[in-house]
């Protein structure tokens, strides 16, 4: 398969702000056009206080900050902005309902053609604030209509992101990746939380019919490796290994189709 356009979203491990593995994968796939919308510190879920979503809608890329605007949903919106013709209102329609981003927030740039591959690797930072604590509420959210998805949990946010992208990019092969294992005292990155996040991502991938790359177990970057190779952010040796692993997973999936 000839991959003309590759688009990725995620956190510091995928982002060019830090590790840049998303762009490394794009180059290995020989993609002619690349949009890496990932940001360091990004969370999968929108931030919230109780049931109130406190994440602002913005098209401005956060500079590797642990802030409420630095979330997957805003990365998706920046992808939509790039796909929307220059100067046009950013619109998309799901279940017969049209959604739009107000022009005062931003308009289309027309800088991206329809992607062949979309890769999303995000969840490591979920839980670093009380406002984005991870929980497996997939069962509660999986049957909700698009308009009812609050994005205040990982499942809801991923379902919203995938359904948005499936609508706007119907021909794209979408891949969700489970998180890498880490070696850190931070509770939200420990094994139990990693496994919880992995379960949510796998369930969303199955529900939406997209592909799942199990980086948690398949990449080789387990807790013992992480201890001496970057703890959270893989060192140069392991960045290469993980990029090779992800590339192989994408290629083997595409060539089977």
Residue ranges and their predicted role:
Residues 21, 75, 154-161, 197-201, ...:
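A general structural detector for well-ordered alpha-helical segments in enzyme core domains, enriched
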Residues 33-35, 173, 209-211:
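Conserved beta-strand segments of alpha/beta enzyme cores
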Residues 5-8, 13-137, 143, 147, ...:
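Conserved SGNH/GDSL esterase-like catalytic core that processes O-acyl groups on lipids
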Residues 82, 160-168, 245, 249:
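A generic secondary-structure signal
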Residues 15-19, 145-156, 191-195, 233-240:
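Soluble non-cytosolic domains of exported or imported proteins
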Residues 121-128, 159-196:
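Active-site segments of SGNH/GDSL-like serine hydrolases
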Residues 51-52, 179-257:
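Catalytic His-Asp segment of secreted/periplasmic serine-dependent ester chemistry enzymes
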């Amino acid at each position: 398969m000839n991959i003309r356009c590759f688009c990725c979203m995620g956190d510091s491990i995928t982002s060019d702000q830090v590790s840049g593995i998303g762009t490394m994968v794009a180059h290995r796939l020989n993609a002619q056009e690349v949009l890496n919308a990932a940001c360091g510190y990004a969370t999968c879920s929108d931030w919230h206080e109780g049931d109130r979503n406190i994440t602002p809608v913005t098209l401005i890329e956060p500079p590797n900050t642990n802030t409420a605007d630095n979330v997957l949903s805003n990365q998706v919106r920046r992808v939509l902005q790039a796909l929307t013709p220059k100067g046009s209102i950013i619109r998309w329609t799901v279940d017969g309902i049209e959604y739009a981003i107000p022009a005062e927030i931003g308009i289309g740039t027309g800088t991206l053609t329809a992607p062949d591959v979309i890769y999303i690797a995000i969840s490591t930072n979920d839980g670093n604030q009380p406002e984005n604590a991870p929980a497996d509420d997939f069962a509660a959210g999986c049957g909700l209509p698009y308009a009812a998805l609050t994005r205040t949990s990982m499942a809801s946010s991923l379902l919203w992101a995938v359904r948005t992208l499936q609508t706007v990019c119907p021909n794209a092969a979408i891949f969700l990746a489970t998180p890498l294992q880490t070696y850190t005292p931070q509770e939200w990155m420990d094994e139990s939380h990693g496994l919880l996040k992995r379960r949510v991502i796998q369930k969303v991938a199955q529900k939406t019919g997209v592909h799942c790359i199990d980086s948690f177990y398949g990449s080789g970057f387990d807790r013992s490796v992480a201890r001496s190779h970057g703890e959270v952010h893989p060192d140069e040796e392991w960045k290469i290994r993980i990029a090779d692993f992800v590339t192989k997973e994408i290629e083997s999936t595409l060539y089977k189709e």
